[in-house]
């Protein structure tokens, strides 16, 4: 993962998201906001880093590009079991790129990459499977979901301080109503624990196609009039703000495990553009 190391080059690595081969406890996320006139250079440099990392058995991540939201924003997300795994994975990543380019060459490559960015930030999110709808039953199911995902719709909810318990209780009620109505799909929840505002929840819907959004049931149909009224009141009391973001999965900038690649090799190993 590209960890931008301040000073010489602090690169919060091309770590990242929404899952990479294991049901980890954390998501290690690097958010890159690219200069509009540098996007082509960003992609070119990133592909070099991805290839060097892949060739030398480096880290694993999935890359996502904002389709609807703040444009020219790319995130790299990796699964981590523990905080200690963050350090280990960073060392693996830096070692892989260093092996390909040498210490000086890797530093120069990272500096060029950094120069294409308007800003960047790292964020650590804890998986909240207890708040998720239709979480994967096992690692095989997890890999199947990630392999088929092409889009991710994320609802970012910022909860007022001291109201987390109320919000989480309401979210569990919504999940129960969705289960009762046999709602298709899944909603995977994570909560920011470092690098962002406390009380921030990410509710991600992983999709094979955008038309899945056309068939999503309304809150009223799931909760009923009384349940919807309760939801609206809890929402007004507990939520400070909500943001909706639609991401596109970018396979050419990703490096997912073989267990995922093997399920959709044509997608995860795209042929270079002529």
Descriptions of predicted regions:
Residues 1-4:
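Positively charged n-region of N-terminal signal peptides that target proteins for export
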Residues 7-16:
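Bacterial N-terminal signal peptides
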Residues 20-229, 234-274:
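Short S/T/G/P-rich N-terminal loop/turn motif that feeds into the first structured element of a domain
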């Amino acid at each position: 993962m590209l960890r931008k190391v301040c000073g010489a080059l602090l690169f919060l690595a091309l770590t990242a998201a929404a899952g990479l081969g294991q049901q980890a406890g954390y998501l290690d996320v690097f958010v890159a906001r690219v200069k509009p006139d540098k996007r082509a250079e960003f992609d070119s440099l990133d592909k070099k880093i991805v290839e060097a990392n892949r060739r030398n058995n480096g880290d694993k991540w999935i890359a996502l590009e904002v389709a609807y939201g703040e444009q020219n924003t790319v995130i790299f997300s990796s699964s981590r079991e523990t905080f200690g795994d963050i350090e280990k994975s960073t060392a693996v990543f830096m070692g892989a790129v260093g092996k390909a380019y040498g210490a000086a060459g890797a530093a120069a490559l990272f500096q060029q990459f950094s120069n294409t960015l308007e800003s960047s930030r790292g964020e650590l999110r804890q998986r909240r499977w207890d708040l998720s709808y239709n979480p994967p039953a096992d690692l095989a199911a997890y890999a199947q979901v990630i392999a088929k995902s092409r889009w991710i719709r994320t609802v970012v909810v910022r909860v007022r301080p001291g109201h987390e318990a109320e919000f989480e209780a309401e979210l569990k009620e919504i999940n129960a109503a969705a289960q009762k109505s046999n709602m298709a799909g899944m909603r995977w929840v994570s909560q920011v624990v470092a690098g962002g505002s406390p009380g921030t929840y990410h509710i991600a819907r992983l999709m094979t196609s955008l038309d899945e959004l056309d068939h999503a049931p309304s809150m009223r149909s799931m909760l009923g009039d009384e349940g919807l009224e309760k939801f609206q009141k809890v929402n007004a009391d507990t939520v400070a703000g909500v943001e909706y973001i639609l991401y596109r999965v970018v396979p050419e900038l990703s490096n997912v495990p073989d267990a995922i690649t093997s399920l959709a090799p044509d997608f995860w190993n795209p042929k270079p553009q002529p």
